């Protein structure tokens, strides 16, 4: 009596396992027609938005940056001492003051809460075309519960699985524990300004095969792996997911993504990972602490699809108790500009598979250990190979013995004078000031943020 049942059960397990194996990297347990279509559409979209001359984007970024900084520096002198990031815990209590061009776009407007969608015009860099849910209605999250099979109206998961554009805000501060990874649909803004919203002690946020997303003002911390199972990813689709990695934010084959003013720490895997052909991404004004593998841009040396990856990393503070990967890159083109690296315990910038990484106007403070002063780390390749990769350091500030090992054509700048003259970033000496308000802001409606 037991024999046939055992055989049928074994056959079912074999079929199920065979179905899961090809898509383990995507965490899709059953790669059905919906996911196949999403994947193909996402790949085609990424190919279409790929910037064949990425230096044009860095040029535009730094031109706007320099123009804005000229204006901001006129008032910097009167506030410099009170806005420096100090060693104590005192918070800035003076009048609203912006320190970089992204924040200048919206922050000091006392009516920001009545004009939230102004934020959609403020992105810069490779993610500058991300407008999120600007063309949609507002959705107010009122409930911090989470049902990953049948999300309840008023919850964050219910908001992000809708098919139409939405600008998602929160009625009150809340802690949200996601029982499985929260899989988003395209054309969404998660805007937590004015309240304290924590995604914590559960799974993270997944942006898979979608486009046009803004995430602003979230605390994301203490993220763990999701166990997998049946998870709803749209109002009209639910499917089997394998175990999630435990990333804070996982960007998988997604395009036009802007992550701004987030505070992140202690996730099981990465804080922010961007893989499998993700492109058109800006990560700005973030504050990152207490983590090992901070950011991964490109997950595999064999994933040549990441050649389309183009990412801007700007005005972020990489802070206390970080260890490595700020970021760790493969393939792609990464612009690392005006960030403050005050802590690392292994290295700051790493990579393999010849990514192009342009570092401009950053501050690097090395740890006390004399064996950990180098900012950079190349992996899995001999020097004869990685010396061909374009890793350039321009206008960076190195402190406490920090040093950057460049590679690629040493005459790169002089050979690109038409571009080089326009792409110098703001001075690294100003980075502490420019990143003073990195992380979640303490915004209150009716007052400048």
Swiss-Prot record:
Belongs to the polysaccharide lyase 1 family. Residues 1-22 form the signal peptide. It comes from Solanum lycopersicum (Tomato). Keywords: Calcium, Glycoprotein, Lyase, Metal-binding, Signal. It catalyses: Eliminative cleavage of (1->4)-alpha-D-galacturonan to give oligosaccharides with 4-deoxy-alpha-D-galact-4-enuronosyl groups at their non-reducing ends. SMART domains: Amb_all. The lineage of its organism: Eukaryota, Viridiplantae, Streptophyta, Embryophyta, Tracheophyta. Binds 1 Ca(2+) ion. Required for its activity. The keyword Cell wall biogenesis/degradation does not apply. The keyword Thylakoid does not apply. InterPro entries: AmbAllergen, Pec_lyase, Pec_lyase_N, Pectin_lyas_fold, Pectin_lyase_fold/virulence, PEL. This is Probable pectate lyase P59. Expressed in anthers and pollen. It is an enzyme of class 4 (lyase). Its cofactor is Ca(2+). Pathway: Glycan metabolism; pectin degradation; 2-dehydro-3-deoxy-D-gluconate from pectin: step 2/5. The active site is at residue 325.
């Amino acid at each position: 009596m037991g024999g046939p049942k055992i055989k049928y059960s074994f056959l079912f397990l074999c079929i199920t396992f065979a179905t899961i194996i090809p898509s383990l990297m995507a965490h899709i347990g059953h790669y059905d027609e919906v996911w196949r279509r999403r994947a193909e559409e996402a790949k085609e979209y990424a190919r279409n938005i790929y910037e064949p001359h990425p230096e044009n984007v860095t040029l535009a970024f730094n031109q706007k940056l320099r123009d804005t900084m000229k204006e901001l520096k006129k008032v910097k002198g009167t506030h410099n001492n009170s806005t420096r990031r100090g060693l104590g815990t005192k918070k800035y209590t003076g009048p609203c003051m912006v320190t970089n061009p992204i924040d200048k776009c919206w922050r000091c407007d006392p009516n920001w809460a009545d004009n939230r969608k102004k934020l959609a015009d403020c992105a810069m860099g490779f993610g500058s075309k991300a407008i999120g849910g600007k063309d949609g209605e507002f959705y107010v999250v009122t409930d911090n519960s989470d049902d990953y099979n049948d999300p309840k109206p008023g919850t964050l998961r219910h908001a992000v699985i809708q098919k139409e554009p939405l600008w998602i805000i929160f009625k009150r501060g809340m802690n949200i524990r996601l029982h499985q990874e929260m899989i988003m649909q395209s054309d969404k803004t998660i805007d937590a300004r004015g309240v304290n919203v924590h995604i914590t002690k559960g799974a993270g946020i997944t942006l898979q095969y979608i486009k046009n997303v803004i995430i602003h003002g979230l605390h994301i911390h203490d993220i763990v792996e999701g166990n997998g199972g049946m998870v709803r990813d749209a109002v009209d689709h639910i499917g089997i997911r394998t175990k999630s990695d435990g990333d804070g934010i996982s960007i998988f084959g997604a395009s036009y993504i802007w992550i701004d003013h987030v505070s992140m720490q202690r996730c099981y895997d990465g804080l922010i990972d961007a893989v499998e052909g993700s492109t058109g991404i800006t990560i700005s004004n973030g504050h990152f602490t207490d983590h090992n593998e901070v950011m991964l841009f490109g997950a595999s040396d064999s994933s040549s699809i990441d050649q389309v990856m183009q990412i801007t990393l700007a005005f972020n503070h990489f802070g206390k108790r970080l260890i490595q990967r700020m970021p760790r890159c493969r393939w792609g083109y990464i612009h690392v500009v005006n960030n403050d690296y005050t802590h690392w315990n292994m290295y700051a910038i790493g990579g393999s598979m010849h990514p192009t990484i342009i570092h401009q106007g950053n501050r690097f403070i090395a740890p006390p250990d004399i064996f950990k002063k180098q900012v950079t780390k190349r992996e899995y390749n001999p020097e004869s190979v990685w010396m061909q990769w374009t890793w350039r350091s321009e206008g960076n500030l190195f402190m406490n013995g920090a040093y950057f090992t460049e590679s690629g054509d040493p005459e790169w700048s002089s050979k690109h004078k038409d571009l080089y003259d326009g792409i110098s970033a703001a001075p690294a000496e100003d980075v502490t000031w420019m990143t003073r308000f990195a992380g979640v802001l303490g915004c209150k409606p009716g007052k400048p943020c």
